[in-house]
C-alpha cells in the first residue's frame, strides 16, 4: 500500500489526512462546522454540513494528490460515535443528527432498565443505559417524532453516513455498532433481546 487518505469526522470539523505507507503525513485538509444547542439537553448537527465538508476536503486532497502525481490506495473513515441520523431509502436525511452529547432520552434509558437489569445489559453490550448511546435516541425518535421514525429506512451513525456518501452502500462496523447498545459483544451480532425491549425494528 502506497498512500491512504483518512477521513476523521469530528464534532467540530472534518479532517482529511493523507499518509504514506511509512505513516508520514503528506497533506491535511479540514472543514469546520458547528452544533446547534437548542437547550441544555438537545444537541444536533445538520448532516448536510458533513456533506459539504466531505466535498471540500476531498477536492483539496485530490488536487494535492494529482499535483504530486501520487497514487491513492485506500480511504479510511473514522468519526464521532453514538450520534443518530434517520434517513430514507434514497439516503436523504429526515432530521438533524441527534448528537452523542444530547441528553433528551433519559426517559428512554429508564424504559430499558425497567425491562433489563443494568448488569445484564452490561454483560450483553459492554455499556450501561445512558443517553450518550444510540438506542435511547432511536427510542426517543420513535416516541416523540413518530412520523420521522416511520419514514426512516435506517437509523445510522456519522461514519455510516459518510461511507454511504462515498459508496452508496449502507454498512457499519463493530466499532460503530458497539456504541448503539444493540450489539452483543460476546457474539459480535445484533442482540435480539435488546432489539425487542427497545422496540427498534
Say what each PLM segment does.
Residues 37-41, 107-111, 182-184:
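Short, charged, surface-exposed secondary-structure boundary motifs
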